[in-house]
Amino acid sequence: MAVKSYQAGVTQYRQSYWQPDYMPLDTDILACFKITPQPGVDREEAAAAVAAESSCGTWTTVWTDLLTDLDYYKGRAYRLEDVPGDDTCYYAFIAYPIDLFEEGSVVNVFTSLVGNVFGFKAVRALRLEDLRFPIAYVKTCGGPPHGIQVERDKLNKYGRPLLGCTIKPKLGLSAKNYGRACYEALRGGLDFTKDDENINSQPFMRWRDRFDFVMEAVQKAEQETGERKGHYLNVTAPTPEEMYKRAEYAKEIRAPIIMHDYLAGGLCANAGLANWCRNNGMLLHIHRAMHAVIDRNPHHGIHFRVLTKILRPSGGDHLHTGTVVGKLEGDRASTLGWIDLLRESFVPEDRSRGIFFDQDWGSMPGGFAVASGGIHVWHMPALVTIFGDDSVLQFGGGTLGHPWGNAAGAHANRVALEACVQARGEGRHLEKEGKDILTAAAAQSPELKIAMETWKEIKFEFETMDKLAIANK
């Protein structure tokens, strides 16, 4: 082995961290960054700087480089690509050796890949577009506490999407009135009701009171309908200790599912809660509150497909994914891409859906995709088509806004869903024939007929801010 020598000074990043001839290993963690460089900084130097600063490099040569094998540990920028339709930025592909990261710690992966490098002056803007976990790393992570099949078996619900509802108004109700709203929606035909992301333990409704009244509602609805029901009890709390206290109480009162805000609450807390749920037979619903602060800017931040991909090994049985047709951001192609990343065992590279790498999840179970945000009965045919069976379709205002009340709103959604599932089984095209399918079902359901009348003019037709960059073919 050649003797290493030390020369003080500053060298260009590209001398060590730009390797266009590098062939990524099966064990490498791969990342695709969208880089907008500062004026005067060439592509290779900016990409190499990102590789260095997100792995083991720094701004100057240090003598302690001689004490390790940098050729083994360093990140390597190995490919650059143009961004279709945008000449201000480009894609940089970087490979990281697996031994740079603690096993089973998505927290540690994020600390490097989206850490201080995002404030680096050599780049004007930086966005993590995609990430590939090698199967060797996937095997060290806990993943969803239970997954799709186990949840269906626990609830005895098969062959259709599940139906949910976020209780509104999201803030201000007393615990007793909150529980009453849950009961009406559950007895009307929903599978789940849900705490909104910002319901924790406020003066108007303390968490223990809410848990008690809600579980009374769940159990009463189960007795009346003969179906398993649930409510996502949000255990997100000021401290991990308080979070586990709330989770333990949910278990004590026989709740089947709890909820966590994984970005606001933190990935460390989320992984710990997922482990607790796995060990205690509790399902875990994940809300993505705060995601748009991170992912909506198309040039700086983290794409939501990465936030989806990081959640799966961290742990969650459900994840909010947007709706395509509702009030929240998300185009159809991209949404289908990250739904697959959440649910499928293997997802191949597909640039038409924004997927830059093959992703093999091995035997790690998948989670339910949750569609929520501005949806109502008219959206049902499209939602069933887009999301398929392994999803939870959550109608908040689209349940509670029914003129006849929560139970009628829930019943309308259940009738619409079952009509779409039946029509799909008959080979009908749900999106093309949706109006006819719903109209026929409404002839036998006054609740659905009124719901269709109420929301027939409601649309959310705004331009998507974060669009797929796909070359014209």
Curated annotation (Swiss-Prot):
Residues of the active site: K168, H287
Cofactor: Mg(2+)
Protein name in the entry: Ribulose bisphosphate carboxylase large chain
Keyword NAD part of the UniProt annotation: no
Positions bound to substrate: N116, T166, K170, R288, H320, S372
Site (Transition state stabilizer): K327
Keyword Plastid: no
Result of changing E184K: In strain: IFO 14297
Organism: Nitrobacter winogradskyi (Nitrobacter agilis)
Segment forming the signal sequence: none
Effect of mutating G354A: In strain: IFO 14297
Main EC class the enzyme belongs to: lyase
Modified-residue entries (N6-carboxylysine), positions: K194
